[in-house]
């Protein structure tokens, strides 16, 4: 007796359905009704089976066999399709463990043309066939065949073929692929129809057409879909948290003078060996001016610190904590404590010396050499230990300063005395009247305006 996947007993009856030509009770589905309605317009022509992915031609290669199960599609390049031994056979009602043996067949799908005119090949899809069926029905289990992966359960006898009938698409629909609990699906692949498949949506539409009691009962019996994690779910969660805290995730954080001062003070409060210089706390504030003992850093890198775009590639040369302690020469030196008026305390220095070795095979070697040459002993090239240029003044302030300098350079005459200021002013009518009495002729000329004409 041949087994039919998806059927517990070939002789069982159902409350609704119709018998096919081979005597097997076939469940009537919405898809069957659609096909039957379409066949009424064929005017006696022979029914043609609907093509599926396994029968569509691709570069002249046709697979004239229907799998009992939905396919597994690859969505990541470079991933290998394989299962752990004893796993990989889809489960179906009515198939005993002894018949769970077969192979996965790789179907190379068609290519398509992209908008820029290039041909892009779709990643392959895999279909399962029981041993003794499908495109390699004559092959023995374990034969080395390109595009074939053999799978079998632990109880299956792989020396004999499986007693499974071929699927007739006009009588049986493909079964959604499911595996036994504990099966590890190959990475980079997904099962077709594992989400909201067409059968699920059809069953939902049928349940809605029933009464309210039946609909409530069927909805309670339906399995709830598994929660899925979207790629951008982490960003959504972060945005919700920020919104809860009253912050806008899309708005860039503005650095004010107060916040920069707080950042700088926070860095300077750390021990010297734990400080990380940046824009708010430049290198020289963290570690002092450049000189013979601290000879690294050009003007730009001293301003930006670790925020400099060239710094990350230099950080590749920095030793790890393990390399620092175990790959360096260390010496513990006690230093003198503070002055006489300072409290007595023991001060030590852990002095170290070592080397970082690299060669031209290091990724980014040329860039590293360029950055090193620009920043090593840069204080000597820039004319002093302090290579940071003074902060430029604003244009308005600079112009005001220039005007002030011009005023300072111009020699200004001393102010006149009060007598001189009074003489230079014009005579009023009262002044003219008074002068007329003084003068003999009693007339004051019109041009008389100062004491020089008197």
Swiss-Prot record:
Residues 260-383 form the CoV N CTD domain. It holds the Pfam family CoV_nucleocap. ADP-ribosylated. The ADP-ribosylation is retained in the virion during infection. Phosphorylated on serine and threonine residues. The modification Phosphothreonine is found at residues 177, 428. Residues 267-277 have a biased composition (Basic residues). Packages the positive strand viral genome RNA into a helical ribonucleocapsid (RNP) and plays a fundamental role during virion assembly through its interactions with the viral genome and membrane protein M. Plays an important role in enhancing the efficiency of subgenomic viral RNA transcription as well as viral replication. Residues 56-197 are annotated as: RNA-binding. GO terms for molecular function: RNA binding. Residues 267-383 are annotated as: Dimerization. Residues 1-62, 159-230, 249-292, 382-428 are annotated as: Disordered. InterPro entries: N_prot_C_CoV, N_prot_N_CoV, NCAP_bCoV, Nucleocap_CoV, Nucleocapsid_C, Nucleocapsid_N. Residues 49-61, 215-227 have a biased composition (Polar residues). RNA binds at residues 109, 125, 167. Residues 64-193 form the CoV N NTD domain. GO terms for cellular component: host cell endoplasmic reticulum-Golgi intermediate compartment; host cell Golgi apparatus; ribonucleoprotein complex; viral nucleocapsid. Belongs to the betacoronavirus nucleocapsid protein family. Keywords: ADP-ribosylation, Host Golgi apparatus, Phosphoprotein, Ribonucleoprotein, RNA-binding, Transcription, Transcription regulation, Viral nucleoprotein, Virion. The modification Phosphoserine is found at residues 170, 194, 389, 424. This is Nucleoprotein. It is found in: Virion; Host endoplasmic reticulum-Golgi intermediate compartment; Host Golgi apparatus. Residues 11-21, 193-212 have a biased composition (Low complexity).
């Amino acid at each position: 007796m041949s087994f039919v996947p998806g059927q517990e007993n070939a002789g069982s009856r159902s409350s609704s359905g119709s018998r096919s030509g081979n005597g097997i009770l076939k469940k009537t589905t919405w898809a069957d009704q659609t096909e039957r309605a379409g066949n009424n317009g064929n005017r006696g022509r022979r029914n043609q089976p609907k093509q599926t992915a396994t029968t569509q031609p691709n570069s002249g290669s046709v697979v004239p066999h229907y799998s009992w199960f939905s396919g597994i599609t690859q969505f990541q390049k470079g991933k290998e399709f394989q299962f752990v031994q004893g796993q990989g056979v889809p489960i179906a009602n009515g198939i005993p463990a002894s018949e769970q043996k077969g192979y996965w067949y790789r179907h190379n799908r068609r290519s398509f043309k992209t908008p820029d005119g290039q041909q892009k090949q779709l990643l392959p899809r895999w279909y399962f066939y029981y041993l003794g069926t499908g495109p390699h029905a004559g092959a023995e289990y374990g034969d080395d065949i390109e595009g074939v992966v053999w799978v079998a359960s632990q109880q299956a006898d792989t020396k004999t073929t499986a007693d499974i009938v071929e699927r007739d698409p006009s009588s049986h629909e493909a079964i959604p692929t499911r595996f036994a609990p504990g099966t590890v699906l190959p990475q980079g692949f997904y099962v077709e129809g594992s989400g909201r498949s067409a059968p699920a949506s059809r069953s939902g539409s049928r349940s809605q057409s029933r009464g309210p009691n039946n609909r409530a009962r069927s909805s309670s019996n339906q399995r709830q879909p598994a929660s899925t994690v979207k790629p951008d779910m982490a960003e959504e969660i972060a945005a919700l948290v920020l919104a809860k805290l009253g912050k806008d995730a899309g708005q860039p954080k503005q650095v004010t003078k107060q916040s920069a001062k707080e950042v700088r003070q926070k860095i300077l409060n750390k021990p010297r060996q734990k400080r990380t210089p940046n824009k708010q706390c430049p290198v020289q504030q963290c570690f002092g001016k450049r000189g013979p003992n601290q000879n690294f850093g050009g003007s730009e890198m001293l301003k930006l610190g670790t925020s400099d775009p060239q710094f990350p590639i230099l950080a590749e040369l920095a030793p790890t904590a393990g390399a620092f302690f175990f790959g360096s020469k260390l010496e513990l030196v006690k230093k003198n404590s503070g002055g006489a008026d300072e409290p007595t305390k023991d001060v030590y220095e852990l002095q170290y010396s070592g080397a970082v070795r690299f060669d031209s095979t290091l990724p980014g070697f040329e860039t590293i050499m360029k950055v090193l040459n620009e920043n090593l002993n840069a204080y000597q090239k820039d004319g002093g230990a302090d290579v940071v240029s003074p902060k430029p003044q604003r244009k308005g302030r600079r112009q005001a300063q220039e005007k002030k300098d011009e005023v300072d350079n111009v020699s200004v005459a001393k102010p006149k005395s009060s007598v001189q200021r009074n003489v230079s002013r014009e005579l009023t009518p009262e002044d003219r009247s008074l002068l007329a009495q003084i003068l003999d002729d009693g007339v004051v000329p019109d041009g008389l305006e100062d004491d020089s004409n008197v």
